[in-house]
Amino acid sequence: MCAQDITMMLGNIAQIDAYKQVYASLGQKCKVHLAVDTGMGRYGFSWDKLGEEIATFAETVEITGTYSHFNNAEKMAHLQLNRFKQALETLKKIGANPGMTHMSNSAAFMTLGDGGLDAVRIGSAFLGKCARGAGDDRLSGWL
């Protein structure tokens, strides 16, 4: 992966120990996309503890991006987006560049757009489908 210049996902401290072993032996920094848990509870550094966790290893990685996932694009979207933006501010305060930022999937993109971030991760919308339910024709004409 090092030779191919692959960016790794990083969502917990255990991963960084493994990355450090490999990349330090090569004299390289591991390129990572930081995962931030803003409420989904599946994967990522907790949004409210991000600063203290990242500070322990920030100098050993190159952050190329920071992302999160919406638990529910409608019910908690604004709360999660605000948490994510707070996490991004925390990174900046400790001198870490968050890189490319992204959070919206297809359903979130339909309601929030890009959320003021750098990118979106549409999947089903790219194919002209919408996970929001049958009869939603807002995607017709996209393809």
Positions of the model-derived regions?
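Active-site loop/helix belt of alpha/beta enzymes
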Residues: 20-26, 31, 36-143
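Catalytic beta/alpha-barrel core
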Residues: 2-16, 68
